[in-house]
Regions:
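C-terminal/peripheral segments of proteins
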Residues: 1-242
């Protein structure tokens, strides 16, 4: 048994379930497959998300056309936040309303109230219930503004929104950060790739590296890391002494 004083979380996230399942189902994972797993945007029907989303389908929406429309979108949702389905955006919002309570092991919010709150919010912010996920979920920094996919509890993590934007859209402010894949070839040579949401110059807006990784990041791509001195020198843009 676990001591209650250790603070060990016994719940399983969707990320944990999806990561375990995807890696267990592949006996030999290539670097490309591993990176694809990291960028997975799906929800497992064995996760907490299934029971929560099912509870929204149980809401009686008779006499309320907007609630009925939201429920229909939920029913048509394809269990992914890849931006391909017209229900992805509202599904993400519905999941997000319950995610903190689930993480804290608190009672989940009332399904009808959550459905109504989401309908009201989407109607006010976007004028429709089925905006494309990438249209409303944005990665923003400086003058760069890009569509961002992924979800609250997916391996491709976009776990929190900053909703106080002038245009009413949702700026991603929490989720994936620095990601690196390191491997060694048969000769023992290290090969690595990395990416982060914005750029290496994290607090220098005047630098070209303040936002230069954003396009790669939203595309789920990586850049090479020039680890060896000779390789770094070959790709250097400028040489200087601090």
């Amino acid at each position: 048994s676990q001591s209650p004083y250790l603070g060990i979380e016994l719940g399983m996230t969707n990320r944990g379930l999806m990561g375990t399942g995807l890696m267990m189902n592949d006996s030999s994972i290539t670097p490309e497959e591993l990176l694809a797993i990291k960028m997975d945007t799906r929800y497992a029907k064995s996760s907490w998300v299934k029971s929560w989303m099912d509870s929204l389908l149980a809401v009686d929406t008779k006499g309320d056309a907007k609630l009925g429309e939201a429920q229909k979108l939920r029913r048509e949702w394809d269990w992914s936040s890849d931006g391909k389905g017209k229900a992805d955006a509202i599904a993400e919002r519905l999941i997000r309303h319950a995610a903190r309570a689930n993480w804290r092991n608190d009672p989940l919010p009332d399904p009808r109230e959550t459905l109504q709150k989401t309908v009201d919010e989407f109607s006010e912010r976007f004028g429709r219930l089925d905006p494309a996920l990438g249209d409303i979920q944005r990665l923003r920094r400086g003058k760069v503004d890009l569509p961002m996919l992924g979800g609250t509890d997916t391996l491709r993590a976009t776990t929190m929104w900053d909703g106080e934007q002038a245009d009413g859209k949702m700026r991603v402010r929490h989720g994936d950060s620095f990601i690196m894949l390191v491997r060694w070839d048969k000769a023992g040579q290290v090969v690595s790739e990395s990416i982060q949401p914005y750029g290496a110059a994290t607090n220098r807006p005047e630098s070209p590296h303040y936002t230069d990784q954003m396009k790669l990041y939203v595309a789920g791509k990586f850049k090479p890391v020039h680890f060896e001195w000779a390789d770094a020198g070959k790709h250097a843009k400028r040489r200087y002494r601090p």
